[in-house]
């Protein structure tokens, strides 16, 4: 069976991340895509990872997930722009991702709007996943059930495996 160790054994990954700090842990998370990036939740450590430009310094960040069920799910005063007819449908992010997006103007500007690839879909494009995470001396391996994100803390760059 495939695991995070398979990615870590890649010489380039190992050299950048260093040694594991602990065992890999299972993660039941959520993911949301935006016009210019995406967010992944990591509930085991109450973080939201935000991904901007792949392979670029400062291309990702980790934010504390402060969302509570009593928080507003969305802001009724936010007006979603009409996208180009050929583009994905734009939506206001909701829940934990929406709270972070609404409270951080810099992230709103960098990420743009949440998107759904199914134009007629009315539901939020948030997807749940079963994955795994492992912390290292200089980064994190995070699997969302589909791909493995290699998060490097020396320059805050990331890559996919």
Language model region names:
Residues 1-161:
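Extended, compositionally biased repeat/scaffold regions that form elongated interaction surfaces
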């Amino acid at each position: 069976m495939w695991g995070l160790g398979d990615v870590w054994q890649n010489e380039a990954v190992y050299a950048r991340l260093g040694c594991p700090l602990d065992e890999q842990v299972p993660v039941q998370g959520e993911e949301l895509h935006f016009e210019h990036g995406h967010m992944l939740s990591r509930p085991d450590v109450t973080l939201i990872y935000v991904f901007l430009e792949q392979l670029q310094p400062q291309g990702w960040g980790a934010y504390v997930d402060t969302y509570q069920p009593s928080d507003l799910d969305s802001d009724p005063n936010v007006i979603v722009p009409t996208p180009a007819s050929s583009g994905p449908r734009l939506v206001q992010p909701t829940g934990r991702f929406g709270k972070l997006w609404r409270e951080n103007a810099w992230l709103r500007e960098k990420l743009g709007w949440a998107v759904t690839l199914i134009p007629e879909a009315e539901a939020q494009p948030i997807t749940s996943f079963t994955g795994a995470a492992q912390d290292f001396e200089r980064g994190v391996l995070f699997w969302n059930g589909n791909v493995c994100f290699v998060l490097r803390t020396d320059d805050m760059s990331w890559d996919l495996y």
